[in-house]
Amino acid sequence: MNAAIDCDDGNPMLRRVALEAIQAWKGRLGRIVEEGVERGEVRREVEPRRIANTIVATLEGALMVSRLEGNKVALEDARDSLEIALEGIAAR
């Protein structure tokens, strides 16, 4: 996360590495959601890209807050909230 933020300061190589890492992570998450849709485990109207972006943004933001506050409360809250959100996309 720090690398992703710092790369805006003009280090194109660092930006590329950080971008590739985030894109790979989001890609893996998106594929997991797509597979869930194909198996009938995830609702068909769910957009894998949106779920992947939401998971990554939530976890990265929670990590930043947890580091700043010096505790794991934000990470635990993010985990619990994502669990509820992911239960909400499950096929019924």
PLM region descriptions:
Residues M1-M13:
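Amphipathic alpha-helical segments used for helix-helix packing
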Residues D9, G40, R44, L63-G70:
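Short coil/turn residues that cap or connect secondary-structure elements
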Residues R16-A21, E38-T54, V73, D77:
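All-alpha amphipathic helical-bundle segments outside canonical DNA-binding/catalytic cores
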Residues Q23-R39, T58, L68-R92:
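C-terminal peripheral helix-coil segments that are non-catalytic and often amphipathic
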Residues R44-M64, S81-A85:
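Hydrophobic alpha-helical segments that form the core
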